[in-house]
């Protein structure tokens, strides 16, 4: 009888240990996943920083965008010019009237001119102003991985990763 009681205690401890292990692993997994709200927070912060005329473009590049470590000077100049182009567009708008939409929320008509090329659509968000799209961004690891002005005409917009 003493042996069966000891065996039950061991089984109970084992079950309890497995339960705690499941809770801990679920918590760790949940921390790694970004929620749609996290993406919007990242995008809003990026837009606010673009809208700030006192913040240098190279600071935005280094702090808000994901780039490769081997970004040559020509590519960096091109990227800075691209940020400035979006920046001018954003600064001309009342940022309180901007909308932040996921790829799914944007609708098929508006997203048909975006070529995802294997990008997870859950990472793609749009900035919209008064029924017009301003730009689209890919968000990864709490930073902007890529952005593009929304295409007008017959050409598809592509995301470029630097």
Indicate where each model-derived feature is located:
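Short solvent-exposed beta->alpha transition segments
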Residues: 59-116
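Exposed beta-sheet edge and beta->alpha loop/turn motif
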Residues: 105-162
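N-terminal export/targeting and maturation segments
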Residues: 30-79
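Bacterial Sec-dependent N-terminal signal peptides
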Residues: 1-37
């Amino acid at each position: 009888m003493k042996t069966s009681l000891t065996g039950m205690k061991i089984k109970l401890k084992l079950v309890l240990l497995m339960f705690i292990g499941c809770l801990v692993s679920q918590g760790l997994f949940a921390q790694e996943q970004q929620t749609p709200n996290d993406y919007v927070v990242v995008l809003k912060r990026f837009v606010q920083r673009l809208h700030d005329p006192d913040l240098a473009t190279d600071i935005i590049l280094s702090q808000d965008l994901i780039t490769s470590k081997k970004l040559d000077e020509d590519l960096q100049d091109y990227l800075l010019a691209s940020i400035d182009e979006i920046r001018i567009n954003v600064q001309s708008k009342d940022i309180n009237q901007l909308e932040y939409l996921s790829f799914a929320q944007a609708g098929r008509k508006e997203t048909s001119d975006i070529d995802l090329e294997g990008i997870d659509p859950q990472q793609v968000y749009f900035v919209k102003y008064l029924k017009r799209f301003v730009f689209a961004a890919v968000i990864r690891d709490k930073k902007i991985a890529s952005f593009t002005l929304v295409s007008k005409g017959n050409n598809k917009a592509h995301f470029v990763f630097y």
